[in-house]
């Protein structure tokens, strides 16, 4: 069940890997899609973790066990070959615990907590996930209006914390898809396809414009919203493809 998860995860891995190939491709602009791939991963986290049945300590401990051992292996290797350096206890805490050298881990470990709280509240109150999405959007826009430096384009810089709003929103969209999965039909419609290409074009055109035209940096708040919508649009196509049996037939051919 949910074979689309594996295919969507593969797409995310390809996009993220490709984003690190700026020095390999003939043109650095070809190394795109990293943030798109990150948001897909967060979408999948929200989708797969929808059913919360454990107490928070047990649930969070399971997340730690799934995330940190791989990090520790990588950290030990990188420190051993001196690709990384650590001087003092705080440097080792940075490498092995938080925030680590990988923005994804520091973000996901914080957002797991927020996601758990939201799901618990939702289960007890029956409030639609859409309202939580709207609340996240409202907080994001409010903080952007008063706290964000609008003089330069940096809204999706993984070195800053602004990207966590779209990561959290992607998780909630994933949870919403899990909640509504059985209601999604198998027919891929023209609006589904057109919507995907329009959002993809808007997203990449927006990134190019913000990167090259300094005067439009004040409108950068729109880009993360388009990004989350694009992830949702992508998921619609993948879920419907799964329900049409596309992935099952493809897997059979591969085997």
Name these PLM-found stretches.
Residues 1-152, 184-197, 240, 244-250:
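Membrane-cytosol interface segments of multi-pass membrane proteins
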Residues 4, 11, 167, 177-184, ...:
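Residue-level recognition of alpha-helix termini/interfacial anchor residues
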Residues 28-31, 127-130, 163-164, 215-223:
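Short, aromatic-rich membrane-interface segments at the entry and exit
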Residues 35, 80, 84, 91, ...:
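Alpha-helical transmembrane segments of multi-pass integral membrane proteins
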Residues 65-69, 106, 110, 163, ...:
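Transmembrane alpha-helices of multi-pass, membrane-embedded glycan-processing enzymes
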Residues 132-180:
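Loop-centered beta-sheet repeat module
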């Amino acid at each position: 069940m949910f074979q689309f998860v594996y295919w969507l995860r593969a797409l995310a891995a390809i996009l993220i890997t490709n984003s690190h190939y700026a020095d390999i491709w003939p043109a650095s602009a070809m190394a795109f899609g990293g943030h798109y791939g990150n948001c897909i991963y967060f979408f999948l986290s929200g989708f797969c973790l929808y059913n919360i049945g454990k107490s928070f300590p047990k649930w969070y401990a399971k997340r730690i066990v799934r995330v940190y051992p791989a990090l520790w292996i990588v950290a030990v290797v990188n420190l051993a070959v001196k690709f990384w350096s650590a001087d003092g206890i705080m440097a080792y805490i940075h490498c092995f615990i938080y925030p680590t050298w990988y923005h994804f881990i520091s973000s996901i470990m914080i957002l797991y907590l927020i996601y758990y709280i939201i799901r618990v509240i939702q289960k007890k109150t029956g409030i639609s996930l859409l309202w939580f999405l709207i609340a996240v959007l409202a907080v994001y826009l409010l903080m952007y209006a008063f706290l964000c430096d609008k003089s330069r384009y940096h809204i999706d810089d993984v070195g800053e914390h602004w990207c966590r709003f779209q990561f959290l929103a992607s998780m909630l969209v994933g949870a919403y898809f899990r909640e509504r999965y059985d209601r999604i039909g198998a027919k891929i419609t023209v609006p589904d396809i057109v919507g995907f290409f329009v959002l993809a074009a808007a997203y990449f055109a927006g990134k190019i414009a913000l990167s090259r035209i300094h005067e439009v940096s004040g409108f950068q708040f729109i880009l993360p919203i388009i990004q989350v919508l694009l992830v949702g649009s992508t998921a619609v196509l993948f879920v419907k493809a799964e329900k049409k049996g596309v992935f099952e037939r493809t897997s059979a051919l591969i085997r």
